[in-house]
Structure formats: C-alpha cells, structure tokens
C-alpha cells in the first residue's frame, strides 16, 4: 500500500512545476502571466494590460481596486496545464508597496522567474526581491522583456546581471535585432532561428518560422547586418559564457536567461518549454523534524496567504495552502499544529484568480483554497501522521504608521471585523498603543498605497468610512526579550512603545539616529527588524 502511494506521489510530483514571477512595476509581469496562460490554454485571448474600457480586464487582477487602477496589489494563484505538466503560477503584487505579500508568496514557490525590462535593466524592486530569492536559494530564471521596443544592448544586460547580482549566467536564447528591427530569437537548445510574425497585441499564439542558422534561405528572412550581428554575438557568448549547469541553477547560483516580448508573444513559448525542462519539481521543506521530502506519504501543508472577500457575493475567507507532502483529499481531517486541534477540510477549492472550482484531491506543489472561518493564520502548518511544523513566515519592519479612526460609532462592529480580517490576511500590519485609553489601532505599512487599500476595502467590503491620523515614526523594531526586557530597560526616550497583533512589544523610532541613540543607551536591549514568527518554527 505504502509503495502504491509513494509511486502515485512520485508521478504527481514529476508532473508539477511551481513558480512565482518577481519584477519591478511596469516590467510587464501581468502581460507575461497572461501569455503563459494563453499558451497553457487556460485563457483563449489575452486580457488587456492597461484594462482599457474596450478590452478585457487582466485575468490575474481581480480585486475592484486593481481593476480601477490597472495594477496588481494582491497575490493570486493561477493553475494551468502544458504538455502534461501542471503549472502552479503564484502571481505576485506588481506594486512595490506590497513586497511583503510577495515574500509570503515566494515562501510557497519552488522557482522564481525574474522579469527585466530590456530598456531599464535591473531596477530597485527587482533587486530587493532577488535578495529574498537568494535567502531561500530559489532557482531564478530570467526573462528579458520588451525586446520589441528600443532597449539596451543584450550583452550589457548580461554583464549587469552577472556583476550586480553575483549570478553566473547562461543565455538559452539570443535576440535578433531590437525595437522595430526585433525579428525573433536564436534558440541555443535546438540551434535554430525562430522568426516571429507580429500580431495585434499578441492576443493569439505567435506564428513563427523556424530555420537553421546555416540554411541558404536565411537571406530571404533576415537582413544581412542582423545575420552577421547574430553570428558575432553567438561567438562572443561561446567565449565568455559557461555551459549550462542545472545543479548550479537549482541552487540559485546560475540563471538561465531568455529574451522576448510578452506583449507580442515573441519568445514566450520557447521560454515556457525550456523552463519546464529546467525548473525544480516540488521540493522538500525545512520543518521541526528536519527536511521533509514530498514523497512522505502523510499529508502536510502550510498556509502562506489569507484572503477575505474574494467573492463579494458570499463574503468568504480563504486560506491559501501549499501542499508539501502526501495526498490531500476532500473532507479529510488534519491536525492544526499551532492550536493542537483537529480540523476537517471541507469544500477545498482549486484557485484561478477570482474563479474557483471544487477539487477532490491535490498533491505536493499544488495550492488549494480552504474555507477559513477564523481558524488559520499565516504560517500555520496542517498535517497528518507524525507531528511537524514548517518554518513560519516573518513580518518585516514597516516604515509608515498611522492611527485608523472610525468616525461613526454605530459602525463599531463592522470596523472591528474589518480590521481583524484584513490584519489576519496580512494586507497590513497592525499595532496597538500600550495606553488603555487609546483604542484606535495603528496601521503599519511599507508604502502609502497599503493605507489606501485598507481604507478602500474597509468601505467597499465592510461599509465603514475611516480616517487616517499619521504618526511621525519611520522605523519599527521588535524587542527580543519581550515585555520583561522592556521593564528592565526602564524609560526609553524618544520612542513609542506599542504591541503588535500577537501582543509582543515593538519600539517605534523617528529616524535611524534615534534608533542608534537607544542602542547606545540600552546596550542589553536586543532589537530586531524582523518580527518573530507568530506561527510555525523560526526560519533558520
């Protein structure tokens, strides 16, 4: 029996790939996501990137505010099949104010796709998210986008990635021309040239002509200067580049690089097929009992995201669970590591942005949606068999703080419910004054847009108009020794002492100088910019 289960698990794991896309805003993430869905048959026509009135809304941007602004501000899950491989694409927020949501999503991913604008190269948000991938040793696949527009020289971009990120590089394909003269790519795997036909906004799969580099007919398709430039570039690549080493790719030391244009579909299919060959299958994860392999027959998984009101008609709450080991089955009863209780997992769902369908089973690498009536927290482990807990997902230091006020006392219950649910799902961090007379919660954010989203959702989902009252602090540090350490430190000048959502002490500082002064005055006070995890074991 055990052997049968393990064979079933092994087959399921071999047929799955799981990844998240990281990029700076406006690098074309939503467009690339939709083109991958187009090739996977999950959608039949790509949605409009800018959500113009006469075109479709982008498939992965489902929240009302996202549709209004044309930006992604939450992470979603998009599942599709391509050539008998099930792909779980963990779509991440496109706005830099929501990098913490992206971090949580990366905790559930086995691979990352780094999307770069060919004209701009590496940008600040991409660098930040790369550091998170590096910490987790995630394999990183690079897609250089927007080759159909004027951009930097490809060799210059390779050099920047290698020098600034410290990655070894391997160009899997190479662009032929840039901007208006972008004709297609040379695929180093098949040693063939793929020339693309331009279609309106790339709403259908790209049509292409495939010819060998030495084909005498090449002059019919390619201008002479582009042909000679390609040959020269390929010679340089052979001289300067290392061979593709999948061990180095899988450990995050080498990045395979692809060139193309998501808007026009140039190079997207070549990227997808190579990615499926090179990417890691679902992998083992660190836990309280060591590294747990996906083939372990007992079910386990962890919650990496909560989302309230995904369906406005039902006012539901969904927990996103990454399946880590074993086979998930509908209506199974599992252990909830944080509370020690047992939970029946009824009504599991397969997620596709705002669309959902009931599922009967799921395997390692899959993401399922579970109905969450206040049971789960981010980082929670659920399991069967021997007790285990996966690494939790920490919160990072916010930089903006503001009281959130409810001017209408008759909306008190709705206000409390909204704050609780939005905090649980990680839309924003919440803190409270240690002064019992101050009841207003303190919102703590990475960027201003998080405040706007909370106010928007409080009104649209809970019917509560709110008012912000900013605080003049810009840094938060958690106190390692808890309230006892605060007591022993005595009076701490020029700070505000608050408690976070788990009741732990946090010090707020006006600036870096203020923080350094407190460190000098209280050398025994251990401060950290990353919160201890509320659920799960502390990441190593």
UniProtKB/Swiss-Prot annotation:
Protein purpose: Increases the formation of ribosomal termination complexes and stimulates activities of RF-1 and RF-2. It binds guanine nucleotides and has strong preference for UGA stop codons. It may interact directly with the ribosome. The stimulation of RF-1 and RF-2 is significantly reduced by GTP and GDP, but not by GMP.
UniProt superkingdom: Bacteria
Location in or out of the cell: Cytoplasm
Main location: cytoplasm
Keyword Signal: no
Similarity remark: Belongs to the TRAFAC class translation factor GTPase superfamily. Classic translation factor GTPase family. PrfC subfamily.
One GO MF term attached to the UniProt entry: translation release factor activity, codon nonspecific
A single BP term in Gene Ontology: regulation of translational termination
Residues the record lists as binding GTP: 23-30, 91-95, 145-148
GO cellular component, one term: cytosol
Stretches assigned to the tr-type G domain: 14-283
Key words of the record: Cytoplasm, GTP-binding, Nucleotide-binding, Protein biosynthesis
A Pfam family per the record: RF3_C
Protein name: Peptide chain release factor 3
CDD domains recorded: RF3 (cd04169), RF3_II (cd03689)
């Amino acid at each position: 029996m055990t052997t049968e289960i393990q064979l079933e698990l092994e087959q399921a794991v071999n047929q799955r790939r799981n990844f998240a896309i990281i990029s700076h805003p406006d690098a074309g993430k939503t467009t690339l996501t939709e083109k991958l869905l187009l090739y996977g048959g999950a959608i039949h026509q790509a949605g409009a990137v800018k959500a113009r009135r006469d075109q479709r809304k982008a498939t992965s941007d489902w929240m009302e505010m996202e549709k209004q602004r044309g930006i992604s501000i939450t992470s979603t899950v998009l599942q599709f099949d391509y050539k008998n491989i099930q792909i779980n694409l963990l779509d991440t927020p496109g706005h830099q104010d929501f990098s913490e949501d992206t971090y949580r999503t990366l905790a559930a991913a086995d691979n990352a796709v780094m999307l770069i604008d060919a004209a701009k190269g590496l940008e600040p948000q991409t660098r930040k998210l790369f550091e998170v991938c590096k910490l987790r040793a995630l394999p990183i696949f690079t897609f250089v986008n927007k080759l159909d527009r004027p951009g930097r020289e490809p060799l210059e971009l390779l050099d920047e990635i290698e020098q600034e990120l410290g990655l070894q590089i391997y160009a899997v394909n190479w662009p032929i021309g840039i901007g208006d003269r972008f004709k297609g790519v040379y695929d180093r795997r098949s040693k063939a040239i793929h020339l693309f036909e331009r279609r309106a906004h790339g709403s259908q799969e790209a049509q292409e002509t495939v010819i060998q580099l030495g084909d005498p007919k090449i002059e019919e398709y390619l201008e002479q200067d582009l042909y000679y430039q390609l040959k020269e570039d390929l010679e340089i690549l052979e001289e300067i580049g290392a061979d593709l080493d999948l061990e180095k790719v899988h450990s995050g030391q080498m990045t395979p690089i692809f060139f193309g244009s998501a808007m026009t579909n140039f190079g997207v299919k070549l990227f997808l097929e190579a990615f499926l060959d090179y990417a890691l299958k679902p992998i083992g994860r660190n836990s309280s009992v060591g590294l747990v392999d996906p083939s372990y027959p007992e079910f386990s998984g962890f919650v990496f995201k909560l989302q309230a009101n995904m369906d406005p008609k039902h006012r539901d709450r969904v927990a996103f669970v990454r399946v880590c080991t074993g086979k998930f089955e509908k209506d199974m009863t599992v252990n909830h590591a944080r509370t020690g209780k047992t939970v029946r997992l009824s009504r599991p769902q397969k997620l596709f942005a705002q669309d959902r369908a009931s599922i009967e089973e799921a395997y390692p690498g899959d993401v399922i949606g579970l109905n969450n009536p206040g049971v789960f927290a981010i980082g929670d482990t659920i399991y069967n068999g021997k007790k285990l807990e996966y690494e939790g997902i920490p919160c990072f230091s916010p930089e903006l703080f503001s009281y959130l006020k409810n001017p209408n006392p008759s909306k008190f219950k709705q206000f409390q419910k909204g704050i609780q649910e939005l905090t649980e799902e990680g839309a924003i961090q919440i803190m409270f004054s240690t002064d019992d007379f101050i009841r207003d919660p303190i919102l703590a954010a990475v960027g201003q847009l998080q405040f706007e989203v909370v106010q928007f959702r409080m009104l649209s989902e809970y019917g509560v108009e709110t008012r912000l009252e900013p605080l003049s602090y810009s840094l938060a540090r958690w106190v390692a020794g808890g309230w006892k350490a605060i007591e022993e430190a005595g009076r701490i000048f020029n700070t505000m002492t608050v408690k976070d959502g788990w009741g732990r002490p946090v010090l707020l500082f006006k600036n870096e100088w203020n923080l350094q002064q407190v460190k000098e005055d209280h050398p025994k006070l251990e401060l950290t910019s990353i919160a201890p995890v509320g659920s799960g074991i502390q990441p190593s």
